[in-house]
């Protein structure tokens, strides 16, 4: 919204009517305490994450370069509509179903091969489901679904999972589809 009041302690908020509207402006009373908490958390080694560049830039201007990193996020409305139409999932009976999703499952940058092999080694304690092209994973507890282009089918299958393992080291954006 272009407000720069945070730089000087949020004296008088010019955007109280922005959504959601605020009736009472207490930001100026709280900002010093919040900044102290941030400093204490940074001293403990906490890493701050922002979904947007401008928020990370503002944070880093106060607390130093690299103290806040960006993980972009978003909502895929088409996917949300599909999920809203799916029937409720019953609690898994028996072994947990774990999903691993990547465009190309062979690529270690997107899929931590060692981690997946360690999960496979759990044998009948889990059911491992892979979604993507070129799965190198085969075992009695692995179900390879392949690369699914039909979003409704993919979301229906993922909706049955108990957990998603996202082990990518090279993505700038999380798998919005699977969040």
Where are these regions (language model features)?
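Conserved catalytic-core segment of nucleotide-activated headgroup transferases in glycan assembly
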Residues: 90-137
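A short hydrophobic beta-strand element within the catalytic core of glycosyltransferases
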Residues: 164-165
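Short alpha-helical segment that forms part of, or immediately flanks, the ligand-binding pocket
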Residues: 155, 178-179
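Carbohydrate-associated surface elements
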Residues: 54, 74
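Aromatic "clamp/platform" in nucleotide-sugar-dependent glycosyltransferases that forms part
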Residues: 169
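Short glycine/acidic-rich beta->alpha loop that forms part of the nucleotide-sugar donor binding site
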Residues: 172-174
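Membrane-proximal helix-turn-helix segments that form the acceptor-binding/catalytic region
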Residues: 3-48
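Short alpha-helical donor nucleotide-sugar binding micro-motif in glycosyltransferases
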Residues: 156-161
């Amino acid at each position: 919204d272009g407000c720069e009041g945070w730089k000087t302690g949020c004296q008088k908020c010019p955007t109280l009517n922005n959504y959601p509207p605020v009736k009472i402006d207490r930001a100026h009373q709280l900002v010093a305490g919040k900044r102290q908490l941030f400093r204490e958390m940074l001293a403990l080694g906490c890493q701050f994450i922002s979904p947007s560049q401008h928020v990370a830039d503002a944070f880093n201007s106060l607390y130093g370069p690299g103290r806040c990193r960006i993980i972009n996020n978003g909502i895929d409305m088409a996917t949300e509509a599909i999920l809203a139409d799916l029937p409720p999932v019953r609690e898994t009976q028996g072994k947990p179903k774990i999903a691993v999703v990547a465009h190309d499952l062979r690529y270690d940058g997107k899929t931590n091969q060692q981690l997946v092999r360690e999960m496979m080694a759990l044998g009948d304690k889990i059911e491992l489901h892979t979604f993507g092209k070129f799965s190198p994973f085969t075992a009695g507890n692995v179900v390879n679904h392949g690369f699914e282009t039909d979003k409704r089918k993919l979301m229906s299958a993922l909706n049955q999972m108990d957990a998603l393992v996202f082990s990518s080291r090279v993505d700038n954006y999380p798998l919005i589809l699977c969040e």
